[in-house]
Amino acid sequence: MDIIFYHPTFDTQWWIEALRKAIPQARVRAWKSGDNDSADYALVWHPPVEMLAGRDLKAVFALGAGVDSILSKLQAHPEMLNPSVPLFRLEDTGMGEQMQEYAVSQVLHWFRRFDDYRIQQNSSHWQPLPEYHREDFTIGILGAGVLGSKVAQSLQTWRFPLRCWSRTRKSWPGVQSFAGREELSAFLSQCRVLINLLPNTPETVGIINQQLLEKLPDGAYLLNLARGVHVVEDDLLAALDSGKVKGAMLDVFNREPLPPESPLWQHPRVTITPHVAAITRPAEAVEYISRTIAQLEKGERVCGQVDRARGY
């Protein structure tokens, strides 16, 4: 069994050694331009077209929760990957726990009005503020996949009203489910906090725009943990300036790194983190990949395969 590995920023040597230890029967090598030798599996992140084109692979693993970097290249270069080759993403591998920590900490930050107190502190102003009430602090989750379900579970501990929206209806205990474009407005109407965990597909690009933001209650909050392309940044800035949106926590952006000239940096109601809400944990990723390869070799059914038509 031959495995090729490519990631532009990961510690390649660590990964190769860890994979060799986890899959002793495999010959694992770092892929470099010009390497056309045979391979059974490819582990990749933002792979060059030549790495995958023409290969008779058993499967490709994207080294992250999203596969948009691969699917976007496939649109321009359909020869890059045979349609019959299964494409897998890292469904969790520790990302769910990280998303839970990130989402809960920020929701509580807003719920306890720490954002308002920070603004007061900046002007040396001492003034206790009325508290928010849980029953009026409904949290809506856009995108009801693996990570969305994890975030919902963690927020249930804090007894917030919860709702989710996705392409198809979900049956999550204690979570009101909305499905399809026809139910999006009803979903948004009660969301004091909107958490975006949608996949990146042609249908979701630019979905968080002026029309969507106007359907939120006045003074709502936005937490974007998915992809920057989901948000029309000018529309969000306008909503923040008008007070329609009271605050935004943004981990992802249309351009990354976020350019220094972006007005988001200096906006008093925006908090920025550099795409760190959930990073790939190497040890857990290696365990998932080795387990999945073992299942594939045995002909067993496995989880995490991407539907290329849907984009997730």
Swiss-Prot record:
Biological role: Catalyzes the NADPH-dependent reduction of glyoxylate and hydroxypyruvate into glycolate and glycerate, respectively. Inactive towards 2-oxo-D-gluconate, 2-oxoglutarate, oxaloacetate and pyruvate. Only D- and L-glycerate are involved in the oxidative activity with NADP. Activity with NAD is very low.
**Any one GO molecular-function label of the UniProt entry:** NAD binding
Recorded catalytic activity of this chain's protein: glycolate + NADP(+) = glyoxylate + NADPH + H(+); (R)-glycerate + NAD(+) = 3-hydroxypyruvate + NADH + H(+); (R)-glycerate + NADP(+) = 3-hydroxypyruvate + NADPH + H(+)
Inducing or repressing factors:
Constitutively expressed.
How is activity affected by pH? Optimum pH is 7.0.
Q: Which domain of life is it from?
A: Bacteria
Q: Which GO terms describe its biological process?
A: cellular response to stress
Q: Quote the EC number.
A: 1.1.1.79, 1.1.1.81
Put simply, this protein is called Glyoxylate/hydroxypyruvate reductase A
Which NCBIfam families does this entry report, sorted A to Z? PRK15469.1
Record's subcellular location: Cytoplasm
Kindly give the Pfam families that the UniProt entry links to this protein.
2-Hacid_dh_C
